[in-house]
Amino acid sequence: YSLIHDDLPCMDDDDMRRGKPTVHKAYDEATAVLAGDALHALAFEILTDGSVSSDPFVQAELVRCLALASGMGGMAGGQAMDMAAESARYDLPTITRLQHLKTGALLTASVEMGAILGRVPPDARSHLINYARDIGLAFQIADDLLDHEGDEAKAGKALRKDDEQGKQTFVSLMGADAARKQARALVEQACGHLAHYGEDAGVLCDLARYIVERDR
């Protein structure tokens, strides 16, 4: 739902997403708003379905985790900062906070909800949460690099819009080479958080490395 809403004319105003027309282009703006709303509600419906967990305390914790990541202390707050960026001059710490909220919060929630379902105690989740926060930031830096120097045909969407809108990004503030090094350093740091899991964390580390090597 967040991508549908992000593409709306009142937000990022994108016509293409992964090589296909965005929902408001394929249908209309009202349909896009309602489709996003419906998918948002569906997420909570799924989390409280007995096939996910029959334990009401686990269900409540899952709902709270996603709600916190979606609201003003998470994605919505990050999007509000992003909208304000068109008329503001953000420094690197502010951009980092923006992206931790806009991109990282939901990604972190995805990892934390897996820990909740796996019955990992709250005080033992820090390694997983730190891993998710690092790859969330690495993902956004990689996204900024793709927007700066990527191929629109591969990306399936318009690129270089942040530059056109005068928004600060990791690339504009750090330069492409430094941003690329930072993304890779974050990936290695993320994998370091999982070191005590041994080979069991291999898939998660592979995912982290894919995030910064992708071309779309």
What are these regions (language model features)?
Residues Y1-A142, H148-G192, D200-V212:
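Mg2+-dependent prenyl diphosphate-binding active-site environment of isoprenoid biosynthetic enzymes
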